[in-house]
């Protein structure tokens, strides 16, 4: 995620006192942004990546949904992961309250968007990274949207109910 997009999420996070943040798909933005939240929960499918990010993002709670697929070589791991429904990963938030900020930047983004709608706090914001991918768009219908585009054309959609 580019700095301009991280800056937009940071601005939203800083506008709420002690926000509760949910992030599907962790990474460098988790490390940077989790310092600014009251509670930060990151959901991940790669145990190797979850461990690496957790070491750097001490303010975040990282929950890994290990699918039991060997992570090396990486391209085979990614191909196998695409075939799985990842229901626990997608549905985890349903039983865990509401969130002020939700970042969708991992696997199964369209399905995660559907869940995000149901667990978004009143006045909350959903961010969808790489929103230029048309197969995510149906999951965003009916939400208010602001589009942020970085210098490479990647889109971050900022949405609310």
PLM feature spans:
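SAM cofactor-binding core of SAM-dependent methyltransferases
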Residues: 2-74
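Short, charged, surface-exposed secondary-structure boundary motifs
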Residues: 49-57, 71-75, 135-140, 154-160
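C-terminal substrate-binding/active-site "lid" region of AdoMet-derived donor-dependent transferases
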Residues: 92-96, 101, 107-161
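Internal catalytic-core helix/loop-beta-alpha segment
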Residues: 63-115
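Generic enzyme active-site microenvironment
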Residues: 21, 42, 103, 127-128
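Generic detector of well-ordered alpha-helical packing
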Residues: 24, 45, 106, 130-131
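Exposed alpha-helical structural elements
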Residues: 8-11, 88, 139
